[in-house]
Amino acid sequence: MTQITERELKKKYLDLLSQHFDTPEKLATEIINLESILELPKGTEHFVSDLHGEYEAFQHVLRNGSGNVRAKINDIFKDKLSTKELNDLTALVYYPEDKLQLIKCDFQNYGQLNVWYITTIEHLIQLIKYCSSKYTRSKLRRALPEQYVFIVEELLYKNNEFKNKKSYYETLVNQVIELKQADDLIIGLAYSVQRLVVDHLHVVGDIYDRGPQPDKIMDTLINYHSLDIQWGNHDVLWVGAYAGSKVCLANLLRICARYDNLDIVEDAYGINLRPLLTLAEKYYDADNPAFKPKKRPDKHERLTQREESQITKIHQAIAMIQFKLEIPVIKRRPNFEMDERLVLEKVNYDTNEITVYGKTYPLKDTCFQTVNRDNPAKLLPEEEEVMNKLLLSFQQSEKLRRHMSFLMRKGSLYLPCNGNLLIHGCIPVDENGEMESFEIDGQTYSGQELLDVFEYHVRKSFDEKENTDDLSTDLVWYLWTGKYSSLFGKRAMTTFERYFIADKASHKEEKNPYYHLREDVNMVRKMLSDFGLNPDEGRIINGHTPVKEINGEDPIKADGKMLVIDGGFSKAYQSTTGIAGYTLLYNSFGMQLVAHQQFNAKEKILSEGIDELSIKRIVDKELQRKKIRNTNKGKELQAQIDILKMLMHDRYLD
């Protein structure tokens, strides 16, 4: 094969580029456009984390832009509208379809309604004009309702200086109303406002877990205009299950059974659980208290006795399968250092005791009827058949394929973005703050390099779904539960102990030292440097651990260098945190941390217009307003400009 020199490659590239920019005027126009964009203020970044399947609460935070929508409305209208009018306009932007129906019921005749239409369209146009003031016209156009772009642009850029077009603008709006298009236009404008107040969304992990509707969250994210995802431990568990890890699949199903969320698997993703139920009905009892499903906070009606009985049996069946499946993985991967988790081999089945970490405990609520004492890892033929069927169903689910592919496409283990490091869990360190090493395939890795290797194997496992026992697939499970995992962040997962040992001391899961060292500003600066970021300007933005504000914990740590934004969307954690978690806004003026109150119901917002927000705390204020030039996007644009200028000099100026 002929070797192409760098010079020849550059010439071929410029030749291709010149086909698109075939005149100096076209090329100059593009350079001028890109250079000008660099001088615009950076767009607003919105950081959310730990959604845990709580679709309703997440939807609300997305619709209100963590309070950004109301702030913009107040900026323009606070001295012009009454409190009720402000509240109504806010609710209309958040939930346009629902609020429109309520408002229309208040009017007695079409004349009153038409006046309201004219006023509301004018208010929304003003709001869009304000929210889009730092965008180019082409970017704004992409955010407008597609079918009404012409009308909206005419109203946005109206200039009646010489009084020649007054009748024209009035006719535009009147015809919209007369032709019954006002509702759709208002709905479209409301969604344009939502889109304009947030330029880019960062989801810092855990879309999945115990909440009831992660699939709806995924559908919402797929349709969102601009985002990235940093995988959480629960996200990787789902990826692992889809990629062929039966032990990940068993874990996932056990969690769904424990939190009465099997309908995610059955109804949302169309997975048939009947074979698992048949197995469970054959071997397990319905009255094991350790395996009764937890009450779901979002479910008002109680489970029937039959439903509870079936879930309790399924819960036991899949837990036993999980503990069996863990054994061969641990044994074939001695570098995982997980021998203490060979729990079924450590049980004394005669005395009903277990010895773990050098201590012997009596066992309660046991369900070992399918365990072979001489070979605890051995699955019954029925268990093996059930897991094969379930794995095939998972991999054949079109909806799950779409969601997992999107997670892989938009996701990563960590992301350096605009000078900050976004990471869900932790950077594994020892007590001295040194990066912990982990051996993979005969080579030792730590820090950023370790995370890069983990991510490589997640992607490899996903691409080779037919391989279920290879190193890559086992490493996806290790990310869920291993002591050097950046996602788990603890020394061991004590699932077995929580089910079967009464002594709660055995349930304790020791956290990686990262979680107390992240309070230290020098430690955080060192981590930022290790990831190639400027420690003077950068921050680590972290999810995964609920901030217990109720106990005085502060989400702003290490002199503002570490921000913990576990969204607290999971209702199960809200009693221990005291709030419904944090989100973060980062615009050209600086960063604001937003503390959310518990989201009760959108009905309250629709009727009263009072938002469940949210206390904003300024993390910092930029001394100089940040421009697109100072962002990752700015670097990309600058690289494009450099190439275009090279073409200009090569073809037209020299």
From Swiss-Prot:
Tell me which EC number(s) this protein carries: 3.1.3.11
Cite the GO molecular-function annotations of the record.
fructose 1,6-bisphosphate 1-phosphatase activity
Q: Which cofactor does it need?
A: Mn(2+)
Reaction catalysed by this enzyme: beta-D-fructose 1,6-bisphosphate + H2O = beta-D-fructose 6-phosphate + phosphate
Keyword entries, A-Z? Carbohydrate metabolism, Hydrolase, Manganese
Keyword Manganese on this protein?
Answer: yes
**One matching Pfam family, short form?**
FBPase_2
Keyword Hydrolase recorded: yes
Q: Where is the composition biased (Basic and acidic residues)?
A: 298-307
Instruction: Give the pathway annotation.
Output: Carbohydrate biosynthesis; gluconeogenesis
Q: Which family does it belong to?
A: Belongs to the FBPase class 3 family.
In its UniProt entry, what is this protein called? Fructose-1,6-bisphosphatase class 3
Task: Supply the Gene3D superfamilies for this chain.
Answer: 3.60.21.10
Chain intervals for the UniProt region annotation (Disordered): 288-307
* Encoding gene per record: fbp
Listed under GO biological process in this entry are: gluconeogenesis
